[in-house]
Amino acid sequence: MKQYTRRSALKLLGIGTVTIAGFGLAGCSGSGEGVKNASEPVPASQAFGQAGVWMVYDGDKQIGKDVAIEEVLFFDGNGNVASYQCESLTFGDLDGLSDDEIVELAKQQDEAAFNAAKQAALDATDEAIQAWQPCYDTLKAEADAGTYDSIGYYGDYGIENVPEEDRAQVVETYQTTLDNTQDALDAANKGQAFNKAAAYQEPEAKPYTLRLETDGSGNAAANESLVFQLAKFSFYQANINVDENDLTSDRTRFRILVDYGWDNNAEIPDSAFGSTKKSIELCSPTYSTTQTVYGTTFGGYSGLATVVNEGHAGFTWDTPDTEGIEVD
């Protein structure tokens, strides 16, 4: 997995020696400098209430240079958070980067994830259309010619092998299959047009919630979670949906006739950009969540970390009387 040094990361971002305006984290009153320098454990409401950048990773792992980052979260200091999907980012890649630079790198990762998901949907849908269109064309030609060659009757194919009294049913089956498959092809082509038109958009910052659970007494914290809307991409993706990808054989087309055509139940999303609720339990593992990677120190909760200064006191839960959080 490729690692980025500070110099190569800055070059990748096109920053060079120029200080970027970025997201306005540095020097503002709502910045996370107090969080980074804390001499006492920082409760969650303060940690996320200030503008800052946090990395989501596998909480069963200890932070290390090769540990993958799943998402980067940007808290705006006003109760909102934006989530960026990461394809190939590790803690080692963040060495020496500022919060602004991390978010810019995460944006590039998020756009790469969007492009990969879009291409996968385009490829799958195109494969399905390319498989089903010739199948439809063949069945339509057989119906137009009145031969119905794909119908099987005890191993023999063609309308002439079907008893006279059953032929009306064969014709009806053919027509139903053609109608269903044409509708499915029309939907697939519309879905493919949706995919092609989709263009990347940076995720929006949305409100997050801190939920605290109390112990049996109701007076002390027993657990706390960060709940937010995780951005996700939605594309139309059609699948061939038959046991064999070869739709050119009589036997396969006969099975299609029995199933009344292409059962394409894929739906066109309202938007390529959606979200799903995600909850991260702010728990501490048996090992320390403060870890130095190269020249950068990370601290936080299990599965959720931010850049801190060396000697940081760590992070903790809120108390039940903390304002602005949900309790039980």
Regions flagged by a language model, labelled:
Residues 36-69:
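Tryptophan-anchored aromatic micro-motifs
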